[in-house]
Amino acid sequence: AIMDTIKDTAKTVAVGLLNKLKCKITGC
């Protein structure tokens, strides 16, 4: 269960970082 939570958190963080990169490159 803990591992699933960590995976979900990692996914959320990764998506957030990707969105920030997209904003820098193409604008939001």
Curated annotation (Swiss-Prot):
Keywords, ordered alphabetically: Amphibian defense peptide, Antibiotic, Antimicrobial, Disulfide bond, Inflammatory response, Mast cell degranulation, Secreted
GO cellular component: extracellular region
One Pfam family recorded for the sequence: Antimicrobial_2
Superkingdom per UniProt: Eukaryota
Subcellular location: Secreted
InterPro entries to which the protein is assigned, alphabetical: Antimicrobial_frog_2
Annotated S-S bridges: C23-C28
Known tissue expression: Expressed by the skin glands.
One GO term of the biological process aspect: defense response to Gram-negative bacterium
Family designation: Belongs to the frog skin active peptide (FSAP) family. Ranatuerin subfamily.
Role of this protein: Mast cell degranulating peptide. Causes histamine release from rat peritoneal mast cells in vitro. Has antibacterial activity against the Gram-negative bacterium E.coli K12 and Gram-positive bacterium M.luteus NCT C2665.
Stated name of the protein: Ranatuerin-2SEb
Species the sequence originates in: Lithobates sevosus
